[in-house]
């Protein structure tokens, strides 16, 4: 599936949010790129909604067509559409690998999943958008444990907090999905209601 592969820092500056996490280039210049980047622009309601949608898309590495499908599914579900949307995004396999601390960024997590390094309930899954469910068990393949990305993951495990809906067993680099996340457990700088308003027009 096509995805954005351009400079993430530029997107972070455009949307005024660190899409990577710990992006020093963004921290030095947290304003839009270009010669008028520091200029104050009057932001319309539509622009705010669009920016929030783009923030979510680029944070999770999802293209527009797929993101709209997530919104439509969230809208069909019971409960708040915004909460449902974030839950669908958070339970992507690549995001779970990132949240568990087995990858430094979501982009790296997506690559690790695509290369077939993970098993879900004993079955190889190489689709980053695969949706995990409550009680799923995610393992790193035995042959992959000795590769550099997972050696680094083992050494750095614990540097980033793991959300309460997940548990990581460090000895085996196993991820346990205890539940689907609630909104309070999703630590992303998003106003999801603006995304709902954007698509509701």
From Swiss-Prot:
Signal sequence, renumbered to the chain: none
One Pfam family it belongs to: S4
The UniProt record lists the keyword Secreted: no
SMART domains in the record: Ribosomal_S4 (SM01390), S4 (SM00363)
Subunit structure and binding partners: Part of the 30S ribosomal subunit. Contacts protein S5. The interaction surface between S4 and S5 is involved in control of translational fidelity.
Function: One of the primary rRNA binding proteins, it binds directly to 16S rRNA where it nucleates assembly of the body of the 30S subunit.
Name of this protein: Small ribosomal subunit protein uS4
Organism for this UniProt entry: Nocardia farcinica (strain IFM 10152)
Highest classification ranks of the organism: Bacteria, Bacillati, Actinomycetota, Actinomycetes, Mycobacteriales
């Amino acid at each position: 599936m096509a995805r954005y592969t351009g400079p993430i820092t530029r997107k972070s500056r455009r949307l005024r949010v660190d899409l990577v996490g710990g992006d020093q280039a963004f921290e030095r210049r947290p304003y839009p790129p270009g010669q008028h980047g520091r200029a104050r622009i009057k932001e319309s309601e539509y622009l705010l909604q669009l920016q929030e949608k783009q923030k979510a898309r680029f944070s999770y590495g999802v293209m527009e067509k797929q993101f709209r499908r997530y919104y439509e599914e969230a809208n069909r579900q019971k409960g708040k559409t915004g909460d449902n949307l974030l839950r669908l995004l958070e339970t992507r396999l690549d995001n779970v690998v990132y949240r568990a601390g087995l990858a430094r960024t979501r982009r790296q997590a997506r690559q690790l999943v695509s290369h077939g390094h993970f098993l879900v309930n004993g079955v190889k899954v190489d689709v980053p958008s695969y949706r995990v469910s409550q009680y799923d068990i995610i393992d790193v393949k035995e042959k992959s444990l000795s590769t550099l990305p997972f050696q680094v993951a083992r050494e750095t495990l614990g540097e980033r907090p793991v959300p309460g809906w997940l548990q990581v067993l460090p000895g085996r680099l196993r991820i346990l999905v205890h539940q689907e996340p609630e909104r309070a457990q999703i630590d992303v700088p998003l106003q999801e209601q603006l995304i709902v308003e954007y698509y509701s027009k």
